[in-house]
Design a protein with these regions (language model features):
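Short Lys/Arg-enriched helix C-cap and helix-to-coil transition segments
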Residues: 51-68
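A short, amphipathic alpha-helix used for macromolecular contacts
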Residues: 1-40, 80-81
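RNase H-like polynucleotidyl transferase catalytic core
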Residues: 114-119, 187-207, 223-225
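Acidic, metal-coordinating catalytic cores used for nucleic-acid/nucleotide bond scission
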Residues: 146-147, 170-181, 200-205
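C-terminal domain-tail junction helix/linker
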Residues: 100, 230-274
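Residue-level detection of the helix-turn-helix DNA-binding "recognition helix"
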Residues: 35, 46-50
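Active-site proximal helix-loop segment of RNase H-like, two-metal nucleases, encompassing DDE(D)
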Residues: 138, 208-230, 241-243
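Extended, low-complexity cationic-aromatic segments
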Residues: 69-156, 259-269
């Protein structure tokens, strides 16, 4: 196939939409539109790494202090202060105690584990967690709600657990309970505590979110619990086992490289990146 037809195919894929109202092209619709075989269309899309069937979501930061906060948090990860413990702290709310209406079907040769679509709700809990950047260990506590009272209670648990000769640097998000006046008052009386807020809409900067993903996938999503007490017990057991073989998440991205990637994304959005 000549270069002109290849260019026509690529241009149509990138800059037009199907006439039938579809949101994106497929190899079948491109083949029908251009008269090129499906296998040839697929081969050229693969060669140019064009994937019209896929989409990725994004959220641009709106925080006026985005760069300052980014450098602050990334600096903690790459160059943690001496005589201090860096903790990534957050809560995972709405952990549901769901009881399946039928026993799970075990996995077997040729078929996966089966769970019923129906379930009985037995309430929710909030999982508070503090992940150590140094060694990956997690301090966790399940609480009935996620108000400032529960957050402050968890900070007290951290304060008792961390040696008094160490400063505590906490990476947190901008949830209202983290900035409550009573939380501020408690922190003001403890000079060893330092709070570092990630930029708005940038929870990906908080390493504890990675742990939340792990525990959700491995211990919560596919489980069945008859009560919040049973769910709490399962979470506590998972955290205990996790800490026996925990390893830190290794942060490698410098602040400048993140900002460069963001600039490229903005260029794509405005059309200057092509």
């Amino acid at each position: 196939m000549g270069d002109e037809r290849v260019a026509e195919l690529i241009n149509k894929t990138l800059h037009t939409k199907p006439a039938d109202g579809s949101t994106h092209w497929s190899t079948r619709t491109l083949a029908g539109e251009t008269g090129i075989s499906k296998s040839t269309v697929a081969r050229y899309l693969q060669a140019f790494q064009i994937k019209p069937h896929r989409v990725e979501s994004f959220k641009l930061p709106t925080d006026a202090l985005f760069i300052e906060k980014l450098r602050d948090v990334v600096g903690l990860y790459l160059n943690p202060p001496e005589n201090a413990l860096v903790l990534c702290v957050d809560e995972k709310s709405q952990c549901q105690a769901l009881e399946r209406t039928q026993p799970m079907l075990p996995m077997g040769l040729g078929y996966v584990e089966g769970v019923t679509h129906d379930h009985v709700r037995h309430g929710t809990i909030t999982l508070f967690a503090a992940l150590s950047v140094l060694n990956g260990a997690v301090l966790a506590s399940c609480k009935p709600r996620h108000r400032h009272q529960e957050f402050l209670s968890f900070l007290r648990e951290i304060d008792k657990a961390v040696s008094q000769d160490l400063d505590v640097h906490c990476v947190v998000d901008n949830y209202a309970s983290h900035k409550h006046p009573k939380v501020h008052a408690w922190l003001a009386q403890r000079p060893r505590w330092h709070m570092h807020f990630v930029p708005t809409y940038s929870s990906w900067l908080n390493q504890v979110e990675r742990f939340f993903g792990i525990i959700t996938d491995k211990a919560i999503r596919r489980g069945s619990s008859k009560s919040v007490k049973e769910l709490t017990k399962k979470i506590d057991s998972f955290v205990s086992q996790y800490n026996e073989n925990c390893k830190p998440f290794v942060w490698t991205a410098a602040a400048d490289s993140i900002l460069e990637k963001l600039a490229r994304l903005c260029g794509r959005i405005t059309g200057t990146g092509h």
